[in-house]
């Protein structure tokens, strides 16, 4: 079996401006933040992003990397809850927003994973969701009669096809098999299966034998057929949680949100945390924690 290990920047070097990317995780939980920071270091722009959003989306918006977003929500999960950079991009019109129900996003990923053009869903009917889609979102009439007679109209959720997807898990092997050791898979497997290029980071790369002995079978969420490249990235989800390896860094998340409130504060944040390598970032975060 091939060894799929690579480096963060080498993985991101495969992106091109204008691509559609999926960012797995959920809000401020197990986000592939090391990959996000690598995208910030790149020249890639004009991205369409598909996400259950958190600071991953906020950071990309802060750097002007995003053109359009398909999202079920955007949340930091704890105070101040709403990501400041996404809020600015959304309200200023800097991005095209395709807001939807969480189930609709999952349905779109499922359609893409199954290589279907769309899947029917009731979510979104009777709501203002279609108004956010600029005519993209269509309905379909069921060819089968409903139990009470008549033919039901449903949302035809389009496949959310991804040029590339990024996910972060706790444990993996060099071939791309991986497991989560926390409490929730966060649909990470769907993001990977919906994509043409699949990139995974993990807290630790271990031997396959150790991987399968470390977790119950149902936690082996990702297999090697879903992954093109894997990166060992300790702290790769920071400042989101990657429990049980570490929780959300609440102090740093507040620091991020507060820094975004002024131009000077944000320039200092970028200089301190986002202008160097991933190793530089982790060292700066260590210094931040030591000073508190």
UniProtKB/Swiss-Prot annotation:
Involved in the final steps of cholesterol and steroid degradation. Opens the last steroid ring of cholesterol by catalyzing the hydrolysis of (3E)-2-(2-carboxylatoethyl)-3-methyl-6-oxocyclohex-1-ene-1-carboxyl-CoA (COCHEA-CoA) to 6-methyl-3,7-dioxodecanedioyl-CoA (MeDODA-CoA). Its EC number is 4.1.99.-. It catalyses: (3E)-2-(2-carboxylatoethyl)-3-methyl-6-oxocyclohex-1-ene-1-carboxyl-CoA + H2O = 6-methyl-3,7-dioxodecanedioyl-CoA. This is Cholesterol ring-cleaving hydrolase IpdA subunit. The lineage of its organism: Bacteria, Bacillati, Actinomycetota, Actinomycetes, Mycobacteriales. Keywords: Cholesterol metabolism, Lipid metabolism, Lyase, Steroid metabolism, Sterol metabolism. Disruption phenotype: IpdAB double deletion mutant does not grow on cholesterol, but grows as the wild-type on glycerol. In the presence of cholesterol, ipdAB double deletion mutant accumulates COCHEA-CoA. Double mutant does not survive in macrophages and displays severely depleted CoASH levels that correlate with a cholesterol-dependent toxicity. GO terms for biological process: biological process involved in interaction with host; cholesterol catabolic process. GO terms for molecular function: CoA-transferase activity; lyase activity. Pathway: Steroid metabolism; cholesterol degradation. SMART domains: CoA_trans (SM00882). Heterotetramer composed of 2 IpdA subunits and 2 IpdB subunits. Pfam families: CoA_trans (PF01144). It comes from Mycobacterium tuberculosis (strain ATCC 25618 / H37Rv). Belongs to the 3-oxoacid CoA-transferase subunit A family. Disulfide bonds: none annotated.
